[in-house]
Amino acid sequence: MPKMKTNKGAAKRFKKTAGGIKYKHATKRHILTKRTTKNKRQLRPNSILPKCEVAGVMRMLPYA
């Protein structure tokens, strides 16, 4: 059976760790002037993916 392909977009966005799957928040690249300081601060830390979405991400990352 051939090797399974890794979804390269997902590989760049998610990282498997012992605590779960880590990801960075969206909407933090540019045009941040309209966002409040509180909102930008809350988007700062990386987060762990919710359990309901783990199966879909793991399907895209077969070797993670």
UniProtKB/Swiss-Prot annotation:
Cytoplasm keyword on record: no
InterPro entries to which the protein is assigned, alphabetical: Ribosomal_bL35 (IPR001706), Ribosomal_bL35-like (IPR021137), Ribosomal_bL35_CS (IPR018265), Ribosomal_bL35_sf (IPR037229)
GO BP, sorted A to Z: translation
Pfam families: Ribosomal_L35p
GO cellular component, one term: cytosolic large ribosomal subunit
UniProt keyword annotation of Ribosomal protein present: yes
Domain of life per record: Bacteria
An example molecular function term from Gene Ontology annotations: structural constituent of ribosome
Keywords linked to the UniProt accession: Ribonucleoprotein, Ribosomal protein
Family: Belongs to the bacterial ribosomal protein bL35 family.
NCBIfam families: rpmI_bact
Protein's UniProt name: Large ribosomal subunit protein bL35
Organism: Vibrio metschnikovii
Gene name for this UniProt entry: rpmI
